[in-house]
């Protein structure tokens, strides 16, 4: 499909061998026509979503759109280095020790694992705290095969250790936040400085804090089962809103299934069984809205693969 441009404010970051479905491109073009949208960027993993595309970033002025962030605020990747030796890896033993981690953690269990509980967050009783969730969310142990730039890695990084990658989201909190705002205001943008915008931003921040805690709890319960510990090397959201500056203009950057390229180390996961890449973005890129792909993309809707 190539690194082509439609109007000057629409960019798709892809080469001639990248397959992107037509519906996703159509959604991107439609979204670019919303009032106050200045620029949009589609990533190589661009695909169609529920009305708005996934794998894209949108930059607007004076207004922002909760619907562009979607119903899983704060979904993202967290990466831990464990104390487990890669050379001594015994998958069957680790799987047996891990057992079932689909049951929500009680407040006592949360306190025992982290010394923190999710009770201060809205709807915390309904959020299945400490669980990964469905869809394409996962937690997986990884081994390091190749280090290309050791000088760019944290000093404590040890390629002889097993690494844990957790991909999880808001466990229903983002859905409840989005539903309330859509019921009250529809899909139109919220004016910055308005009461509606302030309410959403406060709830958005609470969701970001919750998902960070939840990913820590997921890792902590896994480490507890394996009788080991780990150090978090990064925790980066790919569904979120922030006020920032692009090309000298201050506005609102919406990322939906899109990894920030201006926050240090990030993980780009591959398809199941394929390689994932720990990368450090090295330069400011206005065309991509300082954003990278958040995964390998997909050719089919999840429902078609069941």
Model-derived regions: residue spans:
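Short histidine-centered catalytic/ligand-binding loop motif
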Residues: 80-85, 205
